[in-house]
UniProtKB/Swiss-Prot annotation:
The keyword Transmembrane does not apply. Pathway: Sulfur metabolism; hydrogen sulfide biosynthesis; hydrogen sulfide from sulfite (NADPH route): step 1/1. GO terms for biological process: cysteine biosynthetic process; hydrogen sulfide biosynthetic process; sulfate assimilation. Component of the sulfite reductase complex that catalyzes the 6-electron reduction of sulfite to sulfide. This is one of several activities required for the biosynthesis of L-cysteine from sulfate. Belongs to the nitrite and sulfite reductase 4Fe-4S domain family. This is Sulfite reductase [NADPH] hemoprotein beta-component. GO terms for molecular function: 4 iron, 4 sulfur cluster binding; heme binding; metal ion binding; NADP binding; sulfite reductase (ferredoxin) activity; sulfite reductase (NADPH) activity. PANTHER family: SULFITE REDUCTASE [NADPH] SUBUNIT BETA, SULFITE REDUCTASE [NADPH] SUBUNIT BETA-RELATED. SUPFAM superfamilies: Nitrite and sulphite reductase 4Fe-4S domain-like, Nitrite/Sulfite reductase N-terminal domain-like. Siroheme binds at C475. Binds 1 siroheme per subunit. It comes from the Bacteria. Its cofactor is siroheme; [4Fe-4S] cluster.
Length: 562
């Protein structure tokens, strides 16, 4: 007997191509929330329903419903915006969100937090009509925001991978008019709608796509379902290696869930990229599991059906045969903070945004300062998959002015360490409903403690790739870090060790459910050993494996939990 489909499949089937009862829910002023089915559907429109968890207990005591609000994630393939768009993004954050911030994300876009239901349509309409930005398919069981290498040194090649990311994004958008009808007061469609790529039930689960320019792995290919790795010959992109089946999300206590590195299917010509993307997506649509949400990502489809079957299906659907993979190498993935001169002779300033949170802080008015830069900047802005921002294409004549403005508001801070630049956290508490522990609010202090340990052991100029998430879904990609912390309960985390600096190895759990004091005590001991016993140039992740502190993950489905 076949297993029962997960209830989310019913919701999608009954939704009339993602409409549900959202219009009725918007007009219901008795609550700040949507009905349960529609809470799932709004994700496809780029929204997550949340409540402020710091206020839950007090509101319950006062017999009030939770303080519901919404997160909106913008669709911004490749993460590029103009100064005019950034000014509108800033204005909307200030006028229509409770948080008042712009949150850069690991998906190379931005989020708004704290949008009350009464303001949702206004935010959608202001974004679309004033900034020409939408949030279609940035969440839900679909292809999410397509991300690409943002390092601006090779300007012409970056332009090409950015162009492909936008083309893939456009091709994998829905045909349904539901978004325009509900949020933009668009005309209703009366004829029967079709979704040729997604069908009525969309994909089994989220699907993430990247376009990558080696040697930079800033997008973390092994966190994604589909990756196109550019192969460059004679300074031109001649095609792509196609990597399929990466993903990091796990479930605490469920050893049938595991992170997985993507498999290299082979090489394709550049002109075949869209057909291959469509074939991979539709293969996952038809072969992916729909009974268990925790086993529905592409990585499990490959484990269940085998790489060769999945690959053969992609070749059959696309009519394209994979050629042998071409050689490439990833050597780094962190953003190069500071000024870089591109091949286009223009300057690009990468500024560090701690946790990606653009807001005016006491003595550090990042948000206001960015507005002042946008008013005079002649190039564009590029968001990175490491939650930072590139002020791109600055002419030599404007460089001094841009630097002065960036320093004035704290966007350039020479006191920041390499450790801080290489640390990252998800949002977690107080707004994320899945968070089991702090992440964004915990990270700054944790980094200060780790900086002190590095200095104590005489290696203050070195760094460890450190990432923290409040739950095991992995938004900040801790399972590709040298040190990953995954929230287990308030103030308690699972500690993972053994990833590497270029993002090509998964870490393994070293200690389970430890508190913050135990984390620092453990890191003190490990950093001390690393400082004293490492080989020349040996990174922390390589050291803990060579020293047999932790075993290397070879095949995650077999040895990640051992």
């Amino acid at each position: 007997m076949s297993k029962k489909l997960h209830d989310n499949e019913r919701i999608k089937i009954e939704s009339n191509f993602l409409r549900g009862k959202l219009v009725e829910g918007l007009n219901d002023n008795t609550t700040g929330a949507f009905i349960p089915d529609d809470v799932q559907l709004v994700k496809f429109h780029g929204l997550y329903q949340q409540d402020h968890r710091d206020y839950r207990a007090e509101r319950k005591k006062q017999k009030l419903e939770p303080l519901y609000s919404f997160l909106l994630r913008a669709r911004l393939p490749g993460g590029v915006v103009t100064p005019q768009q950034l000014l509108e993004i800033d204005r909307i954050a200030s006028e229509l969100t409770d948080a008042g911030s712009i949150r850069l994300t690991t998906r190379q876009t931005f989020q708004y937090h704290g949008i009350y239901k009464r303001n949702l349509k206004s935010v959608f309409q202001e974004l679309k009509f004033k900034a020409n930005i939408d949030s279609i398919f940035t969440a839900g069981d679909v292809n999410r925001n397509v991300i690409c290498t943002s390092n601006p040194m090779q300007s012409e090649l970056h332009a090409e991978v950015y162009d492909w990311s936008t083309k893939i994004s456009e091709m994998l958008l829905p045909h349904s008019n539901a978004f325009a009808e509900i949020w933009l007061d668009g005309e209703k469609v009366h004829e029967t709608e079709q979704e040729p790529i997604y069908g009525e039930t969309m994909l089994p689960r989220k699907f993430k796509t990247t376009v990558v320019l080696p040697p930079f792995n800033d997008v973390d290919v092994h966190a994604n379902d589909l990756n196109f790795v550019a192969i460059v010959e004679n300074e031109k992109i001649v095609g792509f290696n196609v990597l399929v089946g990466g993903g990091l999300g796990i479930t605490h206590g469920d050893k049938t869930t595991f992170p997985r590195k993507a498999d290299d299917f082979g090489f394709i010509a550049a002109e075949d990229i869209l057909e291959i993307a469509k074939a991979v997506v539709t293969t996952q649509r038809d072969l992916g599991g729909r009974t268990s949400r925790s086993h529905a990502r592409t990585k499990y489809t490959l484990e269940t059906h085998g790489v060769e079957k999945f690959k053969g299906e992609v070749e059959s659907r696309s009519g394209i045969k994979f050629l042998p993979s071409r050689p490439y190498e990833f050597t780094e993935r962190g953003d190069r903070i500071g000024w870089i001169k591109g091949t286009d002779k223009k300057w690009h300033l990468t500024v560090f945004i701690e946790n990606g949170r653009i807001l005016d802080y006491p003595g550090k008015p990042l948000k206001s300062g960015l507005v002042e830069i946008a008013k005079v900047h002649q190039g564009d802005f590029r968001m990175t998959a490491n939650q930072n921002l590139i002020i791109a294409s600055v002419p030599e004549s404007e460089k001094e002015k841009i630097e002065a403005l960036a320093r004035k508001c704290g966007l350039i801070n020479d006191a920041h360490s390499k450790q801080r630049f290489n640390s990252m956290a998800c949002v977690a508490l107080p707004t994320c409903p899945l968070a089991m522990a702090e992440a964004e609010r915990y990270l700054p202090g944790l980094v200060t403690d780790v900086e002190a340990l590095l200095t104590k052991h005489g290696i203050g100029d070195d760094h460890i790739i450190l990432r923290v998430t409040g739950c095991p879904n992995g938004c900040a990609r801790p399972l590709l870090a040298e040190v990953g912390l995954i929230g287990k309960a308030p103030g308690r985390y699972n500690l993972y060790l053994g990833g590497n600096t270029n993002g090509t190895r998964l870490p393994k759990m070293y200690k389970e459910n430890i508190d913050e004091a135990a984390i620092i005590m453990t890191m003190d001991e490990l950093i001390g050993r690393w400082a004293n016993e490492r080989e020349s140039g040996e990174c922390f992740g390589d050291f803990v494996i060579r020293a047999a502190i932790i075993a290397e993950v070879i095949i995650a489905s077999k040895d990640f939990h051992d």
